Amino acid sequence: MRPFLSGSGAAIPSRRTALTLMAALPLAASPVAALAQAETAPPAPDTLRLFRNLLTRMGVAVALNGGPARTFIIDTGAERSAVSRELAQTLGLPSGPDVMVHGVTAAEATPTVRVEAVEVGRRRFPGLEMPVFPRQALGADGLLGLDLLSRFRLVLDVRAGRALLARPGEGVSVGEAGEIGARRQADVVVSGRRGPSGQLILTRVVVDGVKTSAFIDSGAQYSIGNLALMRAARIAPATNPDRPTRMEGIVGGAVAVQTGQARDLGIAGRALGPTPLLFADLHAFSMLNLIEEPALLLGGDLLTRFDHVILDYGRGRVAFGGLLRHA
């Protein structure tokens, strides 16, 4: 899916260009100022696509039915792994029943295909029914969701730009490519409680002094708080009421979001300082029973502030590495 702001007249032509444009925005201005840059006449709502994460965008090799390895994006916010329509057609995968897929913004009945075996590394998972989406929506041949990721220890090695999947309890190296176990700050390990689909819900997150429940969505570009958090932290909306911002996901329609800036955000005891956020009562919060209490979806904009993040689903723990220094 090519990201765009509605009314701007042009889509961002490529991932590389998108990264360049995003890097040019100062931290305090994004995403609020980025949205404000789109001029329209007459005024029309901005549309912010929840496209596959341009910042983390880490994938792993996955083989279906013994075929050649394909790149599947890691998405810790997706309850089910999915395959692109184009790959399903190429492999001649038979149709399965429609299933209800719960996305960030909505739930939607979605077609599936039957897969005899999914191979991830040396592990083989037989007999899966996988939802099907257009490749441009996924941004890859498929994605790995929590139904499979929860069987692993997942390392998002931001500094080295790679993702690692290990068996629970298996050791992994974190650091620059070719650099074994290099760490500049000790990891901070926090425990999480289990969500309905295996998500790890963390509590060591504080937004402007407000204790906040949070979960990691590695497939989301932006971090999004619910309206209960916005009220509790007394964050003033920055969105122009004449130009409402709307957000679209792969599943379901658009939802209205507000923009604002937290004065101080802390994750696992690490202070991130002033941080721009989006706010909406997303379907994802409802699914996790987090509508009434302050809650935050941790997206790529915050995950990439850390050297690495390790999700150990077997032990119910998340480890955050040191903060990266951004120029």
Where are these regions (language model features)?
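Pepsin/retropepsin-fold aspartyl endopeptidases
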Residues: 2-12, 17-327
